[in-house]
């Protein structure tokens, strides 16, 4: 399936996949308002074998076919402080077991 991929200029690492270039008729108006002016990134021929860094091709294809669009959001931010605290706690627990 050929898809047009747009990036948001307002929201970093946020992408919108649609079936037809410049046809945003199936994208809800509130979403487009938050997304901002879409900036075309690429036209992709997506198959089930297509590899994405942050999405599964099957989910992208299904969403575009059923909803008319797929919205890829950035990953949640990593809380390095919490990870460090968890690591220290686990390390302390392991020392206490010995």
From Swiss-Prot:
Location of the region described as Disordered in the Swiss-Prot/TrEMBL record: 75-98
Domain of life (superkingdom): Bacteria
Gene3D superfamilies in the cross-refs: YcgL domain
Listed InterPro entries: YcgL-like_sf, YcgL_dom
Stretches assigned to the YcgL domain: 1-85
Protein name: YcgL domain-containing protein Ping_1076
Species this chain originates from: Psychromonas ingrahamii (strain DSM 17664 / CCUG 51855 / 37)
Highest classification ranks of the organism: Bacteria, Pseudomonadati, Pseudomonadota, Gammaproteobacteria, Alteromonadales
